[in-house]
């Protein structure tokens, strides 16, 4: 009889462990689904940002469209970066120059993987606490490894910071002042060189 009680006790212990594991797993998956829904609802929104690295601090506004992201740097230099899944443009307003680039060959591709994703199972590296949600992605381009972290406030879910690490270099983009905008047109996200004559 004593042997049977010990056996039942062990079984109950394992059932509790399995229940806790799966409920935590489901809760985590539920939060990731909410983050992905939030990301998909970023269309027609903007946020102010402060970007910093070991050498400088820059300020600006980031705009999220349905298929493109536009980043306007306002201080100390006036720059614009517009990216889509396949291409991007870097515009230096002081020099009145534009450079085009392939986003598939840059870490910008990670932004579209995170912001346009609907499948929580494709976001494997997530850390969840009471106050924060971190999504970590890694991409290798031309033998350089980029580690990108998206940090969200947990309740309510709001994107607060993006950290990009490349070897020993890193920069952080702190986001605040989020706004819903009525409509951002295709023209607003145009990649046509504004200084073409």
Region spans (language model):
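An acidic-aromatic
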Residues: 61-110, 169-171
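Short, solvent-exposed coil/turn segments at beta-strand boundaries
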Residues: 41, 63-69, 83-87, 129-130, ...
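Gly/Pro-enriched, hydrophobic low-complexity segments
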Residues: 119-197
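A charged amphipathic helix-loop-strand protein-protein interaction module that recurs
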Residues: 104-123
């Amino acid at each position: 009889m004593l042997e049977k009680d010990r056996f039942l006790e062990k079984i109950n212990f394992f059932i509790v462990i399995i229940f806790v594991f799966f409920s935590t797993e489901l809760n985590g998956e539920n939060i990731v689904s909410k983050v992905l829904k939030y990301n998909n609802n970023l269309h027609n929104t903007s946020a102010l940002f402060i970007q910093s690295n070991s050498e400088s601090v820059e300020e600006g506004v980031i705009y999220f469209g349905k298929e493109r992201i536009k980043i306007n740097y306002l201080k100390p230099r006036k720059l614009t970066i517009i990216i889509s899944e396949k291409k991007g443009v870097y515009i230096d307003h002081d020099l009145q120059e534009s450079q085009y680039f392939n986003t598939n060959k840059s870490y910008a591709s990670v932004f579209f993987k995170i912001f346009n994703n609907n499948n929580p199972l494709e976001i494997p590296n997530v850390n969840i606490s009471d106050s924060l949600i971190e999504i970590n992605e890694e991409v290798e381009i031309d033998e350089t490894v980029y580690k990108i972290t998206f940090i969200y406030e947990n309740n309510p879910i709001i994107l607060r910071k993006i950290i990009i690490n490349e070897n020993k270099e890193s920069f952080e983009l702190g986001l605040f002042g989020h706004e819903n905008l009525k409509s951002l047109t295709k023209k607003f996200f145009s990649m046509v060189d504004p200084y073409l004559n």
